[in-house]
Amino acid sequence: MQGPPRSLRAGLSLDDFIPGHLQSHIGSSSRGTRVPVIRNGGSNTLNFQFHDPAPRTVCNGGYTPRRDASQHPDPAWYQTWPGPGSKPSASTKIPASQHTQNWSATWTKDSKRRDKRWVKYEGIGPVDESGMPIAPRSSVDRPRDWYRRMFQQIHRKMPDLQLDWTFEEPPRDPRHLGAQQRPAHRPGPATSSSGRSWDHSEELPRSTFNYRPGAFSTVLQPSNQVLRRREKVDNVWTEESWNQFLQELETGQRPKKPLVDDPGEKPSQPIEVLLERELAELSAELDKDLRAIETRLPSPKSSPAPRRAPEQRPPAGPASAWSSSYPHAPYLGSARSLSPHKMADGGSPFLGRRDFVYPSSTRDPSASNGGGSPARREEKKRKAARLKFDFQAQSPKELTLQKGDIVYIHKEVDKNWLEGEHHGRLGIFPANYVEVLPADEIPKPIKPPTYQVLEYGEAVAQYTFKGDLEVELSFRKGEHICLIRKVNENWYEGRITGTGRQGIFPASYVQVSREPRLRLCDDGPQLPTSPRLTAAARSARHPSSPSALRSPADPIDLGGQTSPRRTGFSFPTQEPRPQTQNLGTPGPALSHSRGPSHPLDLGTSSPNTSQIHWTPYRAMYQYRPQNEDELELREGDRVDVMQQCDDGWFVGVSRRTQKFGTFPGNYVAPV
């Protein structure tokens, strides 16, 4: 009798020698609970082997072994494709006895067994060429190891490369060389699978968990420091850290403490400080290079700077403070809120700062050393200018200057601002506040004239006067007033007898019994003035003193009558002619008809001379007065300005209405 085939002998197991009545219940349970398990890594094809997941039972004192899948024929299993080393079968459905471990199988939908079970992988399941798991986490037996392998592969270090050739680096500028010089030959201490390696001074990728803001690249670090850092990074992930990390992934809760302590040293200073320090170093190096270039170039010959003509500059629109109150006035500035003295008129002495950007110390190399090379600095110091108006600094970069001061120009910041020096102080100031002196003129400051009171006057108040400004003197009817000086035909300066109150007041409110006598003390040359008009002497005091007084109207020759209301001011004529002043007797009710005027700080006004400057202006926009002491302006009106206050308001006379008053300075432009 011919023996069984060799294939059948190879398929026999211990179950074939157990009686059937002892293994019938085991076979039925194994057929219902078999779970396919993927072995051999699961790459390319899926090779199934079935086993019973339940523990084996003991029969007759021995363990009952599992049955192999080849011993249980099942019509629901079909051949899909042959595994390596096997031959495909010609028939579609084959007996179960012919299944081997190298055959792959699929589960058919028409089968009666439709139990849904997860396919379990042994260990971490199949992996790709790099060792990263490709199976889902829920289908593996050891999810913690799967997590560990996945994390290690994501954050693994790139294999070291080894270069078998040598090369020479081109010579570099010593300023741009790093702290670690690169050798010409790169020996590779560690060889990877590709046979290449790099020097430790090269940049090595590290874990993203160890990233510290502000840390520099490892290219600029010594090799021993890089090696120490690599050792720290490799040793930080302990078993406790892994367990905490995996628990966080499974539960979805945040860790109570950091998983890994930062092995690197913490920066002693914030990143902002480090960046500012680097920027300052780069700026200093750039300034040094530019200064070196300037020393090599020949300095141009100095030429006298032309005189500025502020009258030729086009005026700008009114400030935002008035544009918000009067919709009819055009708004040409920015949306930033500004005080009235910050005007955008390039020709007005009260230059606006809305479009000015203060120059940075790194923009121009000459700003750091005060004017570049010594030759160029001497040339710029020869450009002297005299202040035409008082200028009060609004920021630390600006210079506070008085009228008549001499300032030495260092450079021109832009068309509206200059940088110069005054008594050792360096700062910026408006260009149209100064008058550049010719090169042949000796720069000499002009001191304002001083006055000496020879005899005080006396007056008695006929009406009660309440001053609207700080410089005005309020008094009641019947009080005796000591007259200090006569400001003009309409105003006096005096103080209440027996008190310390002092100020200016209208001449029509008092009965003068004796006029004051003054003497002008000139210690220097007079400021250039217009020859058209003559004016009486007036004193000038600092605005911070208690006697800081400024007149809303400087002395001029008047024609016609005047009243306590400061709107009946006559227009100044071209030639002065003496007129007798005919003062009317105002009623007491006139003292209550004065409305609240706009608060003007006349104590900081610029005219500090015995002669007045009449500057013609033309109204560019319409302005409606809000108080009785303000002028009404219409577009095209001619106005003679005699005083320009630091708050942006002008004091002058309208040729159209023949009235005297105040008005915003950026509504007019010089003619």
From Swiss-Prot:
Residues 46-111, 166-215, 249-268, 295-324, 337-383, 519-611 are annotated as: Disordered. Residues 88-108, 359-368, 560-584 have a biased composition (Polar residues). Both isoforms are expressed in different tissues like heart, placenta, brain, skeletal muscle and pancreas. Isoform beta is especially found in liver. Residues 612-671 are annotated as: Binds to SOS. The modification Phosphoserine is found at S348, S395, S530, S544, S545, S547, S551, S563. InterPro entries: Endophilin_SH3RF, SH3-like_dom_sf, SH3_domain, SoHo_dom, Vinexin_SH3_1, Vinexin_SH3_2, Vinexin_SH3_3. Residues 380-515 are annotated as: Binds to vinculin. Gene3D superfamilies: SH3 Domains. Pfam families: SH3_1, SH3_9, Sorb. One of its GO terms (cellular component) is cytoskeleton. Keywords: Acetylation, Cell adhesion, Cell junction, Cytoplasm, Cytoskeleton, Nucleus, Phosphoprotein, Repeat, SH3 domain. Residues 380-439, 454-515, 612-671 form the SH3 domain. The keyword ATP-binding does not apply. Residues 115-187 form the SoHo domain. Coiled coil: none annotated. Phosphorylated at Ser-530 by MAPK1/ERK2 during cell spreading. Residues 535-553 have a biased composition (Low complexity). GO terms for biological process: cell adhesion; cell-substrate adhesion; MAPK cascade; negative regulation of transcription by RNA polymerase II; positive regulation of cytoskeleton organization; positive regulation of MAPK cascade; positive regulation of stress fiber assembly. The keyword Nucleus applies. One of its GO terms (molecular function) is structural constituent of cytoskeleton. Interacts with DLG5 through its third SH3 domain. Interacts with vinculin by the first two SH3 domains and the proline rich region of vinculin. Binds to SOS (guanine nucleotide exchange factor of RAS and RAC), through its third SH3 domain. The formation of this complex is down-regulated by phosphorylation of SOS. Interacts with INPPL1/SHIP2, SAFB2, SOCS7 and SRCIN1. Interacts with FASLG. Interacts with MAPK1/ERK2. PANTHER family: SH3 DOMAIN-CONTAINING, VINEXIN. Vinexin alpha isoform promotes up-regulation of actin stress fiber formation. Vinexin beta isoform plays a role in cell spreading and enhances the activation of JNK/SAPK in response to EGF stimulation by using its third SH3 domain. This is Vinexin. The gene is SORBS3.
